[in-house]
Structure formats: C-alpha cells, structure tokens
C-alpha cells in the first residue's frame, strides 16, 4: 500500500510516502506531473522498485 501526497512548499515539491511491502505500484497523475517527478518518487522506493517490473503512462 502506498499513501502519497505532494505539496508545494516555497516553490519546491515535497513528497510524503507511507509504504508497506507490495508487489506492484500504480501512479496516476495529470499533465502537470512530469516524467522527472515520477522518477524522483520511484527513487524514494528504490529497494522495492528494484525487485519489480515498472512502467508509466500519462492519462
């Protein structure tokens, strides 16, 4: 399970993630969330992500 929240503080995106062991990750985002931000988010979960296939898409 992931609980994720993004806030902007002083112009800087701040990510809050609470995670447990999981098998897949789903990230839903709009056009304001770019690929670089997705990689930043996934880097916070690096150990878990290294052990699973990943992909992304914009909706």
From Swiss-Prot:
InterPro entries per record: VraX
Pfam family, one: VraX
Top-level division of the source organism's lineage: Bacteria
The protein's name: Protein VraX
Gene from which this protein is expressed: vraX
